[in-house]
């Protein structure tokens, strides 16, 4: 792994299981760290709200801050109508955040570095928003494909462009998240490998530089969870407004 910065993204089997309908369903490192991320989220929420104190402790305050943060994102982008969709938006945010942060830890695996994972998340969001759109607005939901005031002669072209833009939303969401996680981790691995090979890791400047890079990657991990969530809310606003 020290020689190949992309080795950290390799999926390998942890527990081999019998094939199911011809498909390999073995328990992989990706499954393991996804499970770890979910368990950490559950523990964070359970212990955070366990006491329900009027004057919250540090953990309860952290849970309340994350929850209020997600609510503010929803309100700012969808208005009050979007608040009924808090369960989905909060789950998406906290899951991606947990996976991203776990991936920063040494010898871990970044689940969100694989497009298949981020695309699955994006498709869940895409299908959910589409269903909500038709449920809330009916056929009127299709008006997002044709802005008001569009000349009739231009309408067919605009509809095709808007339909294409709508259908590629899950693709852009998934690639944006995966690409940013891959890029950040690869840069850290390349620089860290160079420093180790030069035998200068424990000198002050390179060591502090690596720490700063890891700190920046933590920031990117949080930022990417925020961007995914805010884009989800922007797309949701088309369905509820």
Curated annotation (Swiss-Prot):
| An example molecular function term from Gene Ontology annotations | proton-transporting ATP synthase activity, rotational mechanism
This protein's UniProt keywords: ATP synthesis, Cell inner membrane, Cell membrane, CF(0), Hydrogen ion transport, Ion transport, Membrane, Transmembrane, Transmembrane helix, Transport
Q: Where in the cell is it found?
A: Cell inner membrane
Membrane-crossing ranges are 29-49, 54-74, 86-106, 114-134, 153-173, 177-197, 200-220, 221-241
Q: Which Pfam families match?
A: ATP-synt_A
List, alphabetically, the GO terms of the cellular component aspect. plasma membrane; proton-transporting ATP synthase complex
CDD domains linked to this entry: ATP-synt_Fo_a_6
PROSITE patterns per UniProt: ATPASE_A
* Statement: the UniProt record of this protein carries the keyword Cell membrane: yes
- InterPro entries reported for this sequence: ATP_synth_F0_asu, ATP_synth_F0_asu_AS, ATP_synth_F0_asu_bact/mt, F0_ATP_A_sf
Q: Which domain of life does the UniProt lineage start with? A: Bacteria
Annotated membrane topology is: Multi-pass membrane protein
User: Where is it mostly found?
Assistant: membrane
Q: Report if keyword Acetylation is assigned.
A: no
Self-association state and partner proteins as the record states = F-type ATPases have 2 components, CF(1) - the catalytic core - and CF(0) - the membrane proton channel. CF(1) has five subunits: alpha(3), beta(3), gamma(1), delta(1), epsilon(1). CF(0) has three main subunits: a(1), b(2) and c(9-12). The alpha and beta chains form an alternating ring which encloses part of the gamma chain. CF(1) is attached to CF(0) by a central stalk formed by the gamma and epsilon chains, while a peripheral stalk is formed by the delta and b chains.
- Family per UniProt? Belongs to the ATPase A chain family.
Quote the function comment for this protein.
Answer: Key component of the proton channel; it plays a direct role in the translocation of protons across the membrane.
Q: What's the protein called, per UniProt?
A: ATP synthase subunit a
Species: Wolbachia sp. subsp. Drosophila simulans (strain wRi)
Q: What gene is behind this protein?
A: atpB
